[in-house]
Amino acid sequence: MRRVVAAVLVMLLPARAVPAQASPTLPYSATWADAGWVTAGGALSLLPRTLGLPHGSQACAPCDPATLPGVDRWAVRPVSKSADAASSVVLAGVAAWTALAGLRGLPADQWHGNFAAFAETASWTAASTEWLKVIVRRRRPVLYTSGAVAAAGDRGNQESLPSGHAALAFAAATSYLVMSGHQHLPHRTRNVLLLYVGAAGVSALRVAAAQHFPTDVVAGAALGMGIGWLVPTIHPTINQP
């Protein structure tokens, strides 16, 4: 969870704004209401861990891999700490590149609005992911291995679906895709390609690390793309009353 929160914070870090010659098309608004939405999403994302959710212990340790869908069985293996760490590093890179590509060099009103939209996307993706983990309560791959007994006491091992890393990475990439299309930001094709390749890399590393099943990262990617599309699509612009 701490790595996911850290990745969210990196995604929200601003890049320095510099003067521009022309006004952007339909800049997003940035108001105190946006700050409220970001704060609410961030608070909701931290609430499950604060409340010690999910409650209860594992019914099986180890669990039977035969109960898994065929597409997920091959992902059952011991946790790889190196792949786990690499997935967080790549996620931080995706978040940083999103901020750089979507904020740098813009006039103040556009920069502030884009920052607000990115922040709302990140906070509500994190909140949605954390609560879905609690509701779905799917076991991580480690609970199907010989290391299940030692891992069973960690509540986080009951929170496999959806993948928070995948959700945040694809939310960042998709929010930039939508925003750059509306505002005709420079180098859009290159940046979109890099961001989606990075997001796919994050997802692959989560499976390689045995932190998630393939269906977990697919669910996370779908969730992230949905929120990444929705927030910048409905975010009000300065031209709106």
Pin down the residues of each PLM region:
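Bacterial N-terminal signal peptides
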Residues: A6-P14
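N-terminal transmembrane-helix/juxtamembrane module of multi-pass inner/ER membrane proteins
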Residues: Q21-W97, K133-G156
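Bacterial N-terminal signal peptides that target proteins for export
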Residues: M1-V5
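Boundary at the C-terminal end of the N-terminal hydrophobic targeting segment
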Residues: A17-A22, Q110
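Membrane-embedded catalytic cores of phosphoryl/pyrophosphoryl-handling enzymes
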Residues: V8, T145-P241
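Interfacial segments of alpha-helical transmembrane regions
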Residues: V38, R104-S128
